[in-house]
């Protein structure tokens, strides 16, 4: 079983989701725990258009309901642990807030990487 952790700010964002979306995200996290990097598309994917440096290119998005949820959890792998850095809307739902969530995830996960390195 793979370990999945939330950055504290991402945990706060998760708590703000409607209950059905929190449940869908919990189910997606459970799949990530079971399958780790073997979790196939459409349950996860690379975040497209992220070109802010080598570390940020490894940013992934967890896609609840196989991508049918309007929410995403943005994460990165650190060894045997996945850390969710932010929770935000899907890009086609709200591009501005999606970009903000991606930027926040990158910044938070870069901080985590500095601590674990």
Label the predicted regions.
Residues 1-70, 78-82, 89-117:
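Basic, Lys/Arg-enriched alpha-helical interface segments
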